[in-house]
Amino acid sequence: MAEAASLTFPDGSVRNVDAAMTGADIAESISKSLAKKAVAYAMDGSLRDLSDPVERSGKIEIITREDPRALELIRHDAAHVLAEAVQELWPGTQVTIGPVIENGFYYDFARNEPFTLDDLPVIEKKMREIVDRNKRFSKEVWPRDKAKKVFADKGESYKVELIDAIPEDQDLKIYFQGDWFDLCRGPHMASTGQIGKAFKLMKVAGAYWRGDSNRPMLTRIYGTAWADQQQLDSYLQMLEEAEKRDHRRLGREMDLFHFQEEGPGVVFWHAKGWRMFQNLVSYMRRRLDGVYQEVNAPQVLDHSLWQTSGHWGWYKENMFKVECADEEAEDKRTFALKPMNCPGHVQIFKHGLKSYRDLPIRLAEFGAVHRYEPSGALHGLMRVRGFTQDDAHIFCTEDQLAEECLKINDLILSTYADFGFEEIQVFFSTRPEKRVGSDALWDHAEEIMGGVLEQIAERSGGRIKTAINPGDGAFYGPKFDYVLKDAIGRQWQCGTTQVDFNLPERFGAFYIDKDSEKKQPVMIHRAICGSMERFLGILIENYAGHFPLWFAPLQVVVATITSDADDYARQVTQQLKAAGLTAEADLRNEKINYKVREHSLAKVPVILVCGKREAEEGSVNIRRLGSRDQASLLLAEAIAQLIDEATPPDIRRAKA
């Protein structure tokens, strides 16, 4: 008798079927229309080929192209079609790897002559031909020796190397699309035709094989693929808008910062940019005042501390190190610039005996950290080697963990709201396979944080979306990640709350409990902005440089129409500064339209125009960024209005 499998469907119904039935068979048994639309199926959330037998009992879902999960399959299949197209057009080109990435895919090719942008339309045309052929995807499992021989005979040395890297106990899956085949874990859709035509090749770049600069340079072709043309068009439109908002371009136009070759990955802040940076720090300091103790730990520490923390073992290659001769010692000492603030904060906590009555202790730092990032990964303010973290570490008891996590959540959400971010997602990441701490410890922490996650959703009235990422926690404890959506729909992971079972134990941190016993504190890592530089990059792009008045690096420019108003413009500027506004006078002998245009391009929020009439009346003509409207006000009224507008939201709340 054939082995049976009990399948639970999305509507809750249960059916017993032959375990040898495939996903395609199950779809066909439900309806012919579903079978026609099906591209894959999921067993207990894991995607499979339609041709795979169900094999066992579980929860089953038939996946169609309308399902968001189908996007990964569309992109994966498009990468295979890209590789086939390239080898049809340029025989002898070696294919290497071609994964799905965010919003698309890429494939790396080994070819004597690198591809250029001019090649992309030709490749894209060939890809559409392959899609039209609608060849079936089929899977074979090959013995290791056969796979190596076949790929070696084809001249695919990179594939042979990949096969050697696959563990002996794993099957070697080969996927065919017609006569063309590739080494792949899968899964794939039923045929190339199911990819559709909503794809586009985007760019070419160089990439070292296996990311190793000592290995050959390959050509990487990037593409994007979507379920339909409307989604593709929306994505391309978003990219176009993102290009206009690129913080690197706006940083130049607004004279905020620059980078140069002598300091890769470190920021040269100009006066206006540094003022904006300080505005952010000042805002954050006000939010922490009275709740956190601001501290400052050394930037350079002996490597022995990093050995104790564990960073030296698993993070040493990403640290900046220096050897110094100690006059009193025979050997050189090795120091490192700190890549993170947490070990330093543990040292501060350990300095002096702590009682349970002292807890929670909340230590915050705007700490400069340095991490060695590959030069190819550097990207403006978004990915740098030297940056400032708005780091805090809370040392508390287990009983205080839930309350502290909720307080952190409230602070993070209100901070994001002050900067105009209302669409927030909170992801709860649970224990990974490799971790420290007992199962009982993880059970307790996950139970507490799971309850906090429910409260976050309830208290927001459903406005804050929450989700669980099983197995995605840090090795030292479970965590919350806060993801915000910007003005053009992009998502950015910024804030985090992480429970740490590791560092307090490694450093022997303890407090004295109510029974006069030593007890290890619960340590919480907390960041709101994360990297201050990156957060500023996000803000620049979110606002497209049109900052609210309270956060603008230069709030007001006083521009004269004629030299007759120069003295008055100087007086206006001084009064604005005396009122706490950042202001500059533009007294150049240029036409007023030229001045207005120049300052508008520099994204100055308010321009006060002064001519002979304004000087006589004691008034100003107000022009605002992005508006053609003009308004004449007496100077005192204008200043009062601007002071009110320039009041930061946290101060406004405190006054209410």
UniProtKB/Swiss-Prot annotation:
Entry keyword annotation includes tRNA-binding: yes
GO biological processes: threonyl-tRNA aminoacylation
Protein's UniProt keywords contain tRNA-binding: yes
Any one GO cellular component localisation term in the record: cytosol
Cofactor(s) the protein requires to work: Zn(2+)
Region (Catalytic): 246-548
Amino acids binding Zn(2+): C342, H393, H525
Domain TGS: 1-64
GO molecular function, one term: metal ion binding
Subcellular location(s) of the protein: Cytoplasm
Reactions listed under catalytic activity: tRNA(Thr) + L-threonine + ATP = L-threonyl-tRNA(Thr) + AMP + diphosphate + H(+)
Keyword vocabulary terms for this entry: Aminoacyl-tRNA synthetase, ATP-binding, Cytoplasm, Ligase, Metal-binding, Nucleotide-binding, Protein biosynthesis, RNA-binding, tRNA-binding, Zinc
Domain of life of the native organism: Bacteria
PANTHER family: THREONINE--TRNA LIGASE, CHLOROPLASTIC_MITOCHONDRIAL 2, THREONINE-TRNA LIGASE
Name assigned to this protein: Threonine--tRNA ligase
Species whose genome carries this gene: Chelativorans sp. (strain BNC1)
